[in-house]
Amino acid sequence: MPIAGKFITFEGGEGAGKSTQLTRLAERLRAAGEGVLSLREPGGTPFGEKMRDVLKQPGSAIQPAAEALLFASCRAQLVADVIAPALAAGQVVLCDRFIDSTVAYQAGGRGLDRALIESANRLACGAVRPDLTILLDLDPARGLGRASVRDHGQPDRFEVLGAEFHRKVRALYHALAQEEPGRFFVLDAARPPEAVEEEIWHEVARRFR
């Protein structure tokens, strides 16, 4: 499977199963002999992990514009320090959230100007773009229910936002997938994790065989 040096991102709303499916794909790729680097956003660098605590902490009074710029700052550090070198070395890079999360959450959910968000993403990422984006699509109510169980009833500052916010996020994810059908692979995340895992594996094999 000629997948060395490819960049795959996982996107979706709360509780869609992104981290679960990323871990399962990483395990299968490693079993196939591939070098894999698994990352998450925000995070992946000392700076990013500190900002993750700030951005996800319930009750953090962060203005939407400041929030968007913090995400872009974390991304710029991650791309320069980790992602770009790993891709250049031939590793497969898997990332739990990337540029599309900021567009969906900050432009879709928060209502910020999408063009400005995308401009910040271009500055943060340079020429680095995902080769494949796996969008795990799930009804927000169901996803938030899953997240509540996962977090033992202690939601982060995005999970506590209202249903309308999360519907807007989902709608913009759908728009992004329609605009770039060659990059996005959209799955029904309401199905059992094993079924989702198999569909992802077949798609990765198809694209990069």
Label each residue range with its predicted role.
Residues 102-171:
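A glycine- and Lys/Arg-enriched "phosphate-lid" helix/loop adjacent to the NTP-binding pocket
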Residues 2, 24-26, 141-209:
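NTP-dependent small-molecule kinase module
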Residues 21:
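Hydrophobic positions on the alpha1 helix immediately C-terminal to the Walker A/P-loop
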Residues 32-125, 199:
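ATP-dependent small-molecule kinase phosphotransfer cores
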Residues 1-7:
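Extreme N-terminal, non-catalytic leader segments
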Residues 18:
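Conserved lysine of the Walker
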Residues 15:
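Walker A (P-loop) phosphate-binding loop of P-loop NTPases
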Residues 10:
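Hydrophobic anchor at the beta1->P-loop junction of P-loop NTPases
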